[in-house]
């Protein structure tokens, strides 16, 4: 039974470990299967890289295949790749965190080194010895070996990486997809407002290629944003002649000479809005349209329909037209008119003279087709291919003068060789679809046709055809996930390795070389380490609570390498785009300078293999909404009509309305229901995981919803978790997908359970067969990345039957498998003595007393014992100059005991460091002589607790360097760990043994085996030991064979358990590899209890945040008529201006939920024969219209009582996003609970006992305690560190700094005339070194007088003036006491 309220059929029973099903107001059908794995974005990407469930077409395999084989420069030998193998991690995830090491796996590759037999070697060629039988080169040596190339950080089961013992997350990056993009400057470049069009070809790897118009409509290109050149240079560098260029970009029109002029084909599209200077006549000479008459497209179509196919142009009518090809004198071969030239009156005379009968003209009409390419070509029409290549080379590599072959090779490498240029499959698909090409997807370099088509499309844009691309459209942006990042880093490492191998090959003696000699495993490890440690996208995981973990793994960032920078990103890229619908959450984003650049994946969205985000929709066929779910890309979605999930449908899933609002092409349109193609799968599919947890989200302003989403991630897990009474139904999904809970791997029965372990005997229910034992080790009081406490608690009990993926243990901020970030508290919206002014919060002391918002935080402190030049440091209890009382909580070794209460300046680890010998006074020398040993030869370097920490020691880890003698405490800790390993092994063996011996007894009983001396088998079984059972019944051959088979299976499982145990012990005994010079590391974990106090920040889920201003005694708080004091008072003025009305609706619904629970409690307390019937009747009214109603009807009386008792504290509600209950439904529930349907009640002043004048909104709201705790922010300084140069106290809590007394504060003292106070602030309390020593002496002596010296800042100023060659000297004498400047 899941907490989502699914039905379990007749005889329904609510398990103890299940949450109470919620009263849900959801109307749409939910596709829950898509939500089972919220971190699939991370896991799938990494699995694709390492080759899990992959055909080897990408990832590690493809990198190795691209790199190998590697040949030496002369071709004498070759290093071939055979295969690769990924090993097992040396330590598990928990052990890596504990040891502070990286969770990684070794990668080994099998290499084959082949050396050929050669006859002769020279710099020009190598002559090989050829095998006479095969006619192939003869092999001299062939050596194959498996070689380690380093360790690869492995992703944990939670989608994180453990790097140096710290959990990190690789954030996915949104970047512009490879391909071609067309854009315009939107008229901003020139004051005339003329649109300047441009195109950019972006590869995945390689040089960028830009095309652009200038103000004169000349087309230029740039490579890597260098100096621009005319595009004709690029086309000619590709080998195109002038005629080739004209043929590629312009259509030809053939003019044929006749007696009256030129006969021309009539093309309708050429006459759109044309005004001819001559009469339009047909070939017969009939005038169809008079000269200077404007011919519209309608007229042209009518002429064509009337049969006009050719028309006449007068001889002079071709003036100004562009010739498509050279016009040549037939007799002499001389060129009369060159291709691209315009016809003049002189040319017309020559054409008549040389009897030219047919001319091909370029179809340039200056309206639909412009002469842009032609004009560009004529900038330098005599340029050759070689000239163009050299010109391009000079722009990119200025200052070099290479030969033609080098230039050609360089140009080819820019765009046409896969080693230097890679469009990627995504880029090729985008290029093909954009330009209408049909190039193979595996061709990931540019072709000549690609470049020509890009220029063609750019010219068409200038001619007014088509539209520019929207770079913020999600069809033009893709996601790079963790697998792709690691693959790129892996490729970089392997390329470095390849260069090293080639260098080594040029100098090594092949006769003695082995494959392992060529490979340096540190190369790849260094590249991967740099990425995981220092990349902007490799981030310290937000581990405040389970929601913050999930959100961090689903985050999308536009920042990072290859992405945007926050300073240059404009409004457009940050804004919400229509294609974000169902793909990227429009709500959840940071509030600061990263707003819009960092976002979150929507709930149902997934990323396809090309990196584009897809959103699911239900298919509609003939007005019927089917259950078929299809995922659409942003570029596909615009072509369809997609209805909202809230569209009304009948019982047959047919649309009720004939007309529906749909999304189409980024707009909302009204269409017939027959034309609808798809419908949204759920109203909440547009929001992220965090936003989907906010009930009544639709009633909140978007800015407050954003704050609510972000602040849920800052909620600290509390001492006792409590699920919200008013939720959204997503709580269970988030908890299960976060990894904070423990889910059962297989079906089975709980065999053993305690605070640290759950042991489940897994079995196949159909075959009644034991499949093995699943042992779950729970995380107990572990420290998270943000110092919050991770603690898992079992929710199952002995004998419970669990199914796969059932929640068997809760984690931090989890309540029976549901996310529980805060507490349900009784709230009143009113003012109270001004203490809730400006969002301040008033809290009842009863809340503090009951530890409602108390949280546990775990601090880690580390003590490092080093080997110094004077000798090793030592951990010891007898620390010099420390009294015995301060050492009382240390053990004999000198390490604090677990369970000790420690406070500021308590010693956690006693440690002494050797110091150089000093000259001793006579009395000390006497002691040394008497006792025969040195004294005071070491100094106290113990680990002390910082001044702002107070708590309980809950754990101690001691790591001793391998080879160094272990102390008693480390041996004790090791023995404790071995005991836990023994416990795990014995648990597994006990379960298996019990199952097999039960099966053995069944076998012997069914076979009718007789045992001598016993009348029946039961008496024998009662006395016989387990070992005796195995030797019973062996006289029967059939029974003996079955017993033997069973024994072999039993021994195999037990042997495996012993093997795993020995492996763990061996790893523990292996010791620890510590940094150079470190002998021992001691880590002490202190649990700090944080009670709620003034200054702590609290918030609801609707962006209603505030700071606690006062904790009022419970007896003084306003109370209800029955005397119940409210827990929290919020300012009602904080609601209207913020427009987050969701908190009021939540308060009303929570009030209804609790009062319904109270009414159920009254029915239970009343008892009587009609109690069960009354309960059923009341629950039917509550769950009217819910699926759960039929389950309640099928419950037995006992099950119903259990269910009803769980509802005493309140009936859990679910108000899904965009599907929350309306005010009429809430009023109905309030009436059912027998309270005022307005949701308001009279309150009484707790101090005076008087009733307030009017009713007040009272109810239950879910409040969170955020990690902005006052204990972590406020501090006080008496004496502390000073700055080295200014000698002023440092600032900030981390430096134990003081409060800055700034310029304006000085003005305040001046205004009050407090001269001495001002002098004190500016001198002895700040940077007067001499003065503060004197005032200290005065305090010691009890004297109240003090003298001020010169502040150090004045001396710093003098030094700075001197650095400017201005010598300032301060002079003092009897007559002249002020400063004089020389």
UniProtKB/Swiss-Prot annotation:
Under SUPFAM superfamilies, the record lists: beta and beta-prime subunits of DNA dependent RNA-polymerase
* Protein's UniProt keywords contain Nucleotidyltransferase: yes
**A Pfam family the protein falls into:** RNA_pol_Rpb2_6
UniProt enzyme class? transferase
Q: Which GO terms describe its molecular function?
A: DNA binding; DNA-directed RNA polymerase activity; ribonucleoside binding
Give UniProt keywords alphabetically: DNA-directed RNA polymerase, Nucleotidyltransferase, Transcription, Transferase
Function text: DNA-dependent RNA polymerase catalyzes the transcription of DNA into RNA using the four ribonucleoside triphosphates as substrates.
Record-stated family = Belongs to the RNA polymerase beta chain family.
Specify the protein name.
DNA-directed RNA polymerase subunit beta
In its UniProt entry, the species of origin is given as Anaplasma marginale (strain St. Maries)
